[in-house]
Amino acid sequence: MYQLLFQRLGVTLTAGNDKKTSIPSNQLVGHLIGLILLCDDLNEAFADFQALLQNGIAISSSDRGYLVFDAHVTDCGCHLRAQMIQDVFSYFKNHEVTKLYIFDAVAKKLNELKRHCISLIQTLCWENTSAQKLGFPKNIKSYEELLKLLQWDTADISSAIADSFPMNPNNADQNEKGLVWNVTKLEVVLEFLYCSHFLSKNKIYNKKENLDSVTIDFNNAFEKRQLLSNKFHCQGTGKLGVGCRYLKHAKQSKNSFISVVSNLQSRLALLSIAFLKSRCTLPCDIEALQKNSPRNVSAIPNFLHFLILEREWSQNETPILLAVRKLHEHEHCDLYFEARINPHTFEWTLQHKECCEFEHHTPYIVITALATGSSTTKTAQLLAWELMKAQKNFRQFWLTFMSQHRQYPFEIEHDEDQLLETQVSQDIFELYCQSKREDRNQILFDDSTSLLPKHIFTEYPSIFFNFQKNVCSKHGALVI
């Protein structure tokens, strides 16, 4: 079970990112606080997921549903995570009675570990008791040894997990090349939910004059972590006062926190590639198309994302909600369409709908887009009519957009063309080249009207509509 909740998430590595690096006794309190915060993060993610399945709303954020799992990663793969959460939702929704209790069992063990850590900190830090007197060695060899010393034992739930999930979590392959996307494997689901939730709650929307974007708010997130840490250590008021030997190491450094975030982004990007591999029926090798950024975030060309997803969405009849925002000066109006993809031709069909006409208890793939150019002088009815008229061209629009969309890290070395030419079939490469040459703005409209996709995610329609009302940025729909 170490692999299940800790090795799998990378937290068995010490601050030096080396499994062999030991934990000195004067750093013990800091690592215990780190485990406490991790337990809270895990429990919050799992509780939100259960609440969404059972009640359709997240506990941690009353105005969001599955948006609490809308992670920020630099691989331009938001549409992949949208389908991944759809996969997880569908699996657990169909097995709710027999599967969901696992999250309660895991939460119980995490709470036990948290209480043990808090009690130990009280003894070490406030009562100034030597760690050696409590049976701890001067240097703890690894996080695995620390967890054993903390009596982290999940034998009482291992059998229940084995009964409900075909793959024993203890046998999880830690080799990145062996990483697979399989929602019947509990360790995969737990990692995905935790990484997605953490990277969602710590992101912020930037609303600049000419650009909307999203990033991790490191300053605010780090400050929150520090405030949480202060609740557990003595802050220099214990028996040794300001000279407390644990105080120096009780708080995580900002650089260490940034490394944790980068590690979670890297893991989620790898899971996204594993998802692509599990769904790919194209004549290509996904691993050979993988490129790693200087920050160790892996990516596959966006063009292939779409070719794989259009097959996935059409075969599963995945409900798609296209939300188009039209801006004019300081006013805006929103148009909503339900989209379907033909599994044989991959052509799109659109149905213009009002908010009340969507299935509000079904999570949709939501695509937000911004209409600009001549659209500002058009009525909402005319713009909706033009989009309906152009629906036969929507596939080509998406192929063109995905082939031209700037994607990190491919934009650094400009080698995407060469990579695709050598790794995909001639038909796919020719389709890519043709799409990349086209003028995206001329595919759907005859005038200067332009449609710019902003973001793709999974959400219940009712929650999305309420959330959309509050996102009235001057230059964006639902900012990415």
UniProtKB/Swiss-Prot annotation:
Q: Which UniProt keywords apply?
A: Ligase
What phenotype has been reported when the gene encoding this protein is knocked out?
A: Impairs pulcherrimin production and subsequent red pigmentation.
Indicate the enzyme's highest-level EC class: ligase
Q: Does the keyword Repeat apply?
A: no
Q: In which pathway does it act?
A: Siderophore biosynthesis
In the Enzyme Commission scheme, what number(s) does this protein have? 6.-.-.-
Any one Gene Ontology MF annotation carried by this entry is: ligase activity
Q: What does this protein do?
A: Probable cyclodipeptide synthase; part of the PUL gene cluster that mediates the formation of pulcherrimin, a red iron-containing pigment composed of two cyclized and modified leucine molecules that acts as a siderophore, a chelator that binds iron outside the cell for subsequent uptake. Two leucine molecules are cyclized via a cyclodipeptide synthase, and the resulting diketopiperazine is oxidized by a cytochrome P450 monooxygenase to generate pulcherriminic acid (PA), which can then spontaneously bind iron to form pulcherrimin.
Descriptive protein name: Probable cyclodipeptide synthase PUL1
Protein's gene: PUL1
